[in-house]
Amino acid sequence: MGRSLKKGPFVDSHLIEKIEKLGAAKKPIKTWSRRSMIIPDFVGHTFLVHNGRTFQSVYVTENMVGHRLGEFAPTRTFKKHGAHTEKASVK
């Protein structure tokens, strides 16, 4: 169930303050707020989004508006599954 339209998108207030303070400067903004929704004011800015261990660089484009910051900073690293070897197929 999604968020009610009358409530509007959730964005942490400190992110909006930082965007307003930066203005035209494109300095990366470090944040732990993966839950914040990307709004049109964020387009063209770079965010450093925490993934639980490190900060992932996320450059915001117009296609990302309406999504959450956390969607673009994966928390799990995929280690490939075991390859089929000749030894396994001999059985």
UniProtKB/Swiss-Prot annotation:
CC annotations in GO: cytoplasm; small ribosomal subunit
Xref: PROSITE patterns: RIBOSOMAL_S19
Keywords: Ribonucleoprotein, Ribosomal protein, RNA-binding, rRNA-binding
GO molecular function terms listed in the Swiss-Prot or TrEMBL record: rRNA binding; structural constituent of ribosome
UniProt-listed GO biological process terms: ribosomal small subunit assembly; translation
Highest rank taxon of the organism: Bacteria
NCBIfam families in alphabetical order: rpsS_bact (TIGR01050)
Record PANTHER family: RIBOSOMAL PROTEIN S19P FAMILY MEMBER, SMALL RIBOSOMAL SUBUNIT PROTEIN US19M
Functional description taken from the UniProt entry: Protein S19 forms a complex with S13 that binds strongly to the 16S ribosomal RNA.
Annotated family: Belongs to the universal ribosomal protein uS19 family.
This protein's name: Small ribosomal subunit protein uS19
Organism: Methylacidiphilum infernorum (isolate V4)
Name of the gene this protein is made from: rpsS
